[in-house]
């Protein structure tokens, strides 16, 4: 719909929905510090990459949350909410 109304619309990291996994999923993890330490280790190993955290519901077997936890310092695609437009 946006492409029809606005012409070609280009985004950056969102275009590719396939992300490389850092390690095996942390099924049964109940300690948030484990998750934070894995995020820290991944950021240290890949400082110039987007890092995304994805959370799943084990009972329903669906994704319940997913968001970026690290944006590389070299990224220039961020805009303040007031400066964003479609």
Swiss-Prot record:
It is found in: Plastid, Chloroplast. Keywords: Calvin cycle, Carbon dioxide fixation, Chloroplast, Photorespiration, Photosynthesis, Plastid. InterPro entries: RuBisCO_ssu, RuBisCO_ssu_dom, RuBisCO_ssu_sf. Coiled coil: none annotated. Its main location: plastid. It comes from the Eukaryota. GO terms for biological process: photorespiration; reductive pentose-phosphate cycle. Signal peptide: none annotated. Disulfide bonds: none annotated. GO terms for cellular component: chloroplast. The basic functional RuBisCO is composed of a large chain homodimer in a 'head-to-tail' conformation. In form I RuBisCO this homodimer is arranged in a barrel-like tetramer with the small subunits forming a tetrameric 'cap' on each end of the 'barrel'. RuBisCO catalyzes two reactions: the carboxylation of D-ribulose 1,5-bisphosphate, the primary event in carbon dioxide fixation, as well as the oxidative fragmentation of the pentose substrate. Both reactions occur simultaneously and in competition at the same active site. Although the small subunit is not catalytic it is essential for maximal activity. PANTHER family: RIBULOSE BISPHOSPHATE CARBOXYLASE SMALL CHAIN 1, CHLOROPLASTIC, RIBULOSE BISPHOSPHATE CARBOXYLASE SMALL SUBUNIT, CHLOROPLASTIC 1. Heterohexadecamer of 8 large and 8 small subunits. Belongs to the RuBisCO small chain family. This is Ribulose bisphosphate carboxylase small subunit, chloroplastic 2.
């Amino acid at each position: 719909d946006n492409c029809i109304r606005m012409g070609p619309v280009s985004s950056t990291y969102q275009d590719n929905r396939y992300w490389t996994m850092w390690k095996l999923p942390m099924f049964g993890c109940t300690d948030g510090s484990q998750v934070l330490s894995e995020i820290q280790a991944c950021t240290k190993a890949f400082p110039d990459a987007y890092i995304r955290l994805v959370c799943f519901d084990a009972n329903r077997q669906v994704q319940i949350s997913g968001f970026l936890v690290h944006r590389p310092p070299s990224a220039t695609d961020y805009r303040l909410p007031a400066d964003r437009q479609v």
